[in-house]
Amino acid sequence: MARQGVIASMHALALLLGAFAAIPTGVQSIGVCYGVNGDNLPPASDVVQLYQSNGINLLRIYFPDANPLNALSGTSIGLIMDVPNTDLASLASDPSAAAAWVQSNVQASRRSACRYIAVGNEVSGGDTGSILPAMQNLNAALANAGLGGSIKVSTAVQSDVTQGFPPSQGTFSQGYMAPSRQYLQSTGAPLLSNVYPYFSYVGNPAQIDLKYALFTSPGTVVQDGSNAYQNLFDALVDTFVSALEENAGAGNVPVVVSESGWPSAGGDAATAANAQTYNQNLINHVGQGTPKRPGPIETYIFAMFNEDQKTGAESERHFGLFNPDKSPVYPINFS
């Protein structure tokens, strides 16, 4: 989920001052995260209809919630389903717990099109030691259920697991990421990356140009060898790519942007106009890819609704594309 604190690491500070070029169309894979931290949200069946009516073909949920899973049954909407951070230790230590999790949450809802299982979201501290064994146990459970390879198992991380500038110098700053990236390479799973130019900007507005964060600057900001960076999103994604490529055995791991967004109220630069600009430009841009990884980037916007019960900074409650009554917070076009 979107974070309360600023996660702009030093490499993001340096991706500054700047400019940007025309944004192409042609997005193939745009999704939206579906959070439920609200007391006034519509029923899941209405939510799935809202996805379908807007042409949104990918969805992320943060725990195996039976209501959206049932509503998704029989649709073609692709799904990321999270394992809550609180469940990691048991899944890491007990293969039978992983088997039970798969049976209850994947096999029981097999008519929903689950693409990825995210083993934790932005896990920190000592819990990071549970990520790899939990992924291993879940993959084994999927294989035993006859689902090996059809559902990829990964984990969702934020930008502060990387460091380095320019993007070509990106490395992982957290020790648990080295074995994780090699495991992802061995299974063919992507790294799920939460990418927020918003947090980088609000943490360093004197050094990072708002236009660079919003995809609206007129020229190159960072020249990194032959790669020209015209927006902060590309620079942050390619820092992940470089960190994966640092190990020759993990250079082919795909990057899926599992969260990105901009709040419409409640914080610095959090306006409906900026949120509309960022999210519409993101939709239009990700079909192009980044300088290091041309081609469509599967990307999930955070979030579907403004959620009045989210904790933390006021802006956390204003990342939604839609109000709880299903009216748009601002116009957005997914086509």
Swiss-Prot record:
Accumulates in aleurone layers. Much lower levels are found in the embryo, and none in starchy endosperm. GO terms for biological process: carbohydrate metabolic process; defense response. It is an enzyme of class 3 (hydrolase). GO terms for cellular component: extracellular region. Residues 1-29 form the signal peptide. Induction: By pathogen infection. Keywords: Glycosidase, Hydrolase, Plant defense, Secreted, Signal. The active site is at E122, E259. Its EC number is 3.2.1.39. This is Glucan endo-1,3-beta-glucosidase, acidic isoform. It comes from Zea mays (Maize).
